[in-house]
Amino acid sequence: MKLSHLDEKNHPKMVDVSDKNITSRIATASGMIYMSQEAFDVIKNNTAKKGPVLQTAIIAAIMGAKKTSEIIPMCHPLMLSKVETDIMEFVKECAFKLIVTVKCEGKTGVEMEALSGVSIGLLTIYDMIKAIDKSMRITDILLESKEGGKSGKFVRS
């Protein structure tokens, strides 16, 4: 299989999408962060010294999605029309799951924007709570679903 990000001299390039049709694109990604009971309680009780952790993580996730083309070399800058987040608590596991959905009308997909949003949001939680628990684990960052474009629909089973 020929890689689209390499030219005939095997040099990196950004893929030319100028001939592609503009279609509705949507992608959802998720990831988990596991922590100690103490760190989990600080987040739940909103008593972190650095401020409201989950609210800050949501803002960071949105910013991460919007800035994807600046940190992932071959990503095209996209005009996003929606970035939506959700955070689920897992009390028994002392964990949070961050879910990010990104949408645009464009010539290329938004999977990387959704994945970047999740990554930056979870890293923000880590940053804000690391004084309490440096052993936190960020895991399972993955694409849940995507629609649009020639590759069609994908839903993780």
UniProtKB/Swiss-Prot annotation:
GO process terms (BP): Mo-molybdopterin cofactor biosynthetic process
Active site per database record: 127
Entry-linked InterPro entries: MoaC, MoaC_bact/euk, MoaC_sf, MoCo_biosynth_MoaA/MoaC, Mopterin_CF_biosynth-C_dom
Binding site for substrate: 74-76, 112-113
TM region(s), chain numbering: none
Pathway assignment: Cofactor biosynthesis; molybdopterin biosynthesis
Sorted UniProt keywords: Lyase, Molybdenum cofactor biosynthesis
EC number: 4.6.1.17
SUPFAM superfamilies: Molybdenum cofactor biosynthesis protein C, MoaC
GO molecular function, one term: cyclic pyranopterin monophosphate synthase activity
One protein family per Pfam: MoaC
Catalytic activity line of the entry: (8S)-3',8-cyclo-7,8-dihydroguanosine 5'-triphosphate = cyclic pyranopterin phosphate + diphosphate
CDD domains from the UniProt entry: MoaC_PE
HAMAP family per UniProt: MoaC_B (MF_01224_B)
Subunit description: Homohexamer; trimer of dimers.
PANTHER family, per database record: MOLYBDOPTERIN COFACTOR SYNTHESIS PROTEIN A
Role noted for this protein: Catalyzes the conversion of (8S)-3',8-cyclo-7,8-dihydroguanosine 5'-triphosphate to cyclic pyranopterin monophosphate (cPMP).
Family: Belongs to the MoaC family.
Protein name as it appears in the record: Cyclic pyranopterin monophosphate synthase
